[in-house]
């Protein structure tokens, strides 16, 4: 993978609609909620939550499987609390991972999460520099 990533967005209307293009990928629609937009796509802040959840979940999954753990399902929910005035940045983000596995124990999960948060997930590392991220997990036996 190249060290340089790129994305281009083009407006789709006279309001806040955009179509995002990343080379080799399907386009993605972005928009804002009324009154500024038409609510026809993800908002940029929603995509930040999606990126964080995906990056963290992927990192945890890779690390657990490297430890020869059986992981049948990973669900990550992300919820961000925004500032009330502009810029309406995230003040805090809560991540919750639900790992379905017959052989992952809480101590391993805590260790894997620390590694994912500090080494494996670049989205987490970038966001944690400016946002408090609180992480929890649930282990489900499969």
Identify what each model region corresponds to.
Residues 1-50, 61-142:
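Extended beta-strand/beta-hairpin segments
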Residues 55-56:
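Alpha-helical metal-binding/catalytic segments enriched in His/Glu/Asp
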């Amino acid at each position: 993978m190249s060290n340089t990533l790129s994305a281009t967005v083009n407006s789709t209307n006279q309001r806040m609609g955009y179509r995002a293009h990343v080379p080799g990928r399907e386009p993605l629609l972005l928009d804002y909620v009324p009154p500024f937009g038409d609510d026809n796509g993800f908002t940029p802040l929603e995509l930040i939550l999606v990126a964080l959840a995906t990056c963290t979940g992927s990192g945890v999954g890779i690390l657990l499987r490297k430890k020869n753990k059986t992981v049948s399902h990973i669900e990550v929910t992300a919820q961000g609390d925004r500032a009330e005035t502009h810029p309406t940045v995230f003040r805090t983000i809560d991540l919750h991972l639900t790992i379905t596995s017959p052989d992952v124990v809480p101590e391993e999960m805590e260790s894997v999460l620390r590694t994912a948060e500090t080494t494996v997930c670049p989205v987490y590392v970038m966001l944690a520099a400016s946002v408090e991220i609180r992480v929890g997990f649930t282990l489900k036996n499969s």
